[in-house]
A protein has these predicted regions:
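Short segments within alpha-helical structural elements
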Residues: 220-248, 394-452
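Coil residues (strongly favoring Ser/Thr
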Residues: 7, 44, 257-258
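A small-residue-enriched
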Residues: 18-36, 67-132, 230, 236-251, ...
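Sec/SRP-type N-terminal targeting helices
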Residues: 78, 94-95, 131-159, 209, ...
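Periplasmic alpha-helical coiled-coil/stalk elements that build and connect Gram-negative outer-membrane
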Residues: 146, 153-270, 381, 385, ...
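Regulatory alphaC helix of protein kinase catalytic domains
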Residues: 40-68
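Sec-dependent bacterial lipoprotein signal peptides
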Residues: 1-16
Length: 457
């Protein structure tokens, strides 16, 4: 018996170099130019990836909506239940180290030649315990732990997406509110222009065509006002869904939150920080880690499993009276099962596990590349919109002067109604575009917040 134990111990030590005991080594190297060659990086603690959402989105009303969404959103609640499922699986993997017990009481009654019935009772308890010499249970536990962390990363990704979606929808409403205010103001101004043109026609300084053209443009603006109101209603409904509520009007401040719009640039931190900050990148690495341990499990299937089993129980002797105190029976067995040929299933399973591990590795690499690309796009979007805003301000200032001059010239009969119409229409489009560009600037901030992992809790 001692020789057998020594033999098994030596075999276990020999096989420890075969890969079934190795642990996954987390990724620690990320290309310095992951965000793009033109993006300067710095290892700073105040980069946007380390800020909480409250520090980025400072509008009090928006903060209320985000907190409400974090409490009620159904997608986030589903992600929380997914974490609970993974926690249960992790607990099961931990308990696999413990022995199993089974109790199966039995009773029989028999008689011979119409004699007195004889009752027999048996109360057996069976136990078995797998000794994890070859790492099957250990690797299963490590895989379950990786999957648990992945479920937590998924929950964080859903949370980050929810915060970004609420912020994006809220600022969409503010953009539409501003565009609606501009359109309503223009509608009123255009009505005054129509009345002025009609007065000029009555004075012989304009014709019917001018009045009709002015009216047509005025009606176009009226319909655009209705379109904007419809869009506002649709966006409010979308935000209500994010808050897990039925459609209703959303109260808002009506002003732009510009606390971060005044920055010349955003510090984004160094790319390696994304491994810790961005949940989808972490999740992709957890998938790789789980696949790594699944491959280890597939390798361990080639080695024997050692199970200690035993049983103990009480039975009364057959043919004795019911008051017989009975007998105690106990047995113990150690078994070793060595797989020899399983129709190629173990070999096939190992090949599948290795292939899935390579797939997970490529997915992780692609997740990193996607993340770097998203950071680059968000930075460029923000900076481009910020640069454009300078020119939009100058354009609107020039168009206001042009409209004022053209209107005066028309009143004195020195220009046509078409020039006034063109000046007013161009000014309206420029003002609407300026508001949309301001929204694009804020979108860049939101996208950057999400691209860098959603900040800290």
């Amino acid at each position: 018996m001692k020789k057998q134990i020594i033999t098994l111990t030596v075999a276990a030590l020999t096989l420890s170099s075969c890969g079934i005991y190795t642990q996954y080594k987390p990724a620690t190297e990320v290309p310095d130019n992951l965000y793009g060659e033109e993006v300067a990086v710095a290892d700073t603690v105040d980069n946007i990836g380390n800020l909480s959402w409250q520090e980025i989105f400072t509008d009090p009303r928006l903060q209320e909506l985000i907190e409400q969404g974090l409490r009620n959103n159904t997608d986030l609640q589903s992600a929380q239940w997914r974490v609970k499922e993974a926690e249960a699986a992790m607990l099961s993997a931990k308990l696999a180290y413990l022995p199993s017990f089974a109790l199966s009481p039995q009773g029989t009654a028999s008689s011979f030649d119409k004699g007195k019935a004889v009752q027999t009772y048996t109360l057996p308890v069976a136990a078995s315990w797998e000794i994890d010499i070859f790492g099957r249970i250990r690797n299963a536990k490590r895989q379950a732990k990786a999957l648990l962390e992945q479920s937590r990363d998924y929950k964080q990704a859903v949370r980050t997406q929810l915060i970004a979606s609420i912020a994006n929808t809220y600022y969409t409403l503010l953009m539409l509110d501003n565009q609606l205010a501009i359109s309503v103001r223009t509608e009123k101004s255009w009505k005054e222009t129509v009345d002025a043109t009609r007065a000029l026609m009555e004075a012989g300084l304009a014709n019917e065509a001018a009045v009709s053209q002015m009216k047509a443009t005025y009606y176009t603006i009226c319909t655009s006002v209705l379109d904007l109101k419809e869009q506002i209603n649709q966006v409010e409904n979308s935000l209500s869904l994010l808050l897990a509520e039925s459609p209703h009007a959303i109260e808002r401040t009506g002003t732009w939150d510009s606390s971060y719009m005044m920055k010349e640039h955003f510090p984004v931190g160094i790319p390696v920080q994304m491994l810790a900050n961005r949940p989808d990148v972490r999740s992709a690495e957890r998938s790789l880690e789980a696949a790594f341990y699944a491959t280890n499990q597939a390798r361990s299937a080639f080695y024997p499993s050692i199970v200690l089993s035993g049983s103990a129980g009480w039975t009364n002797s057959a043919g004795s009276m019911i008051v017989n105190p009975g007998k105690f029976i106990a047995t113990a067995v150690a078994s070793l099962t060595q797989p020899l040929f399983n129709k190629g299933a173990n070999i096939a399973q190992l090949k599948i596990a290795k292939a899935q591990q390579e797939e997970a590795k490529l997915s992780f690499q692609q997740a990193l590349l996607n993340a770097g690309s998203e950071v680059n796009e968000a930075l460029v979007k923000y900076q481009t919109a910020r640069d454009k805003s300078v020119y939009y301000d100058k354009q609107i200032n020039s168009l206001n002067k042009a409209l004022e001059s053209t209107s005066l010239l028309m009143q004195h009969g020195n220009t046509t109604y078409l020039e006034v119409l063109t000046a007013q229409q161009t000014l309206l489009n420029a003002e609407l575009t300026q508001v949309a560009n301001r929204f694009t600037e804020m979108q860049g901030v939101i996208n950057l917040y999400q691209a860098l992992g959603g900040g800290r809790d």
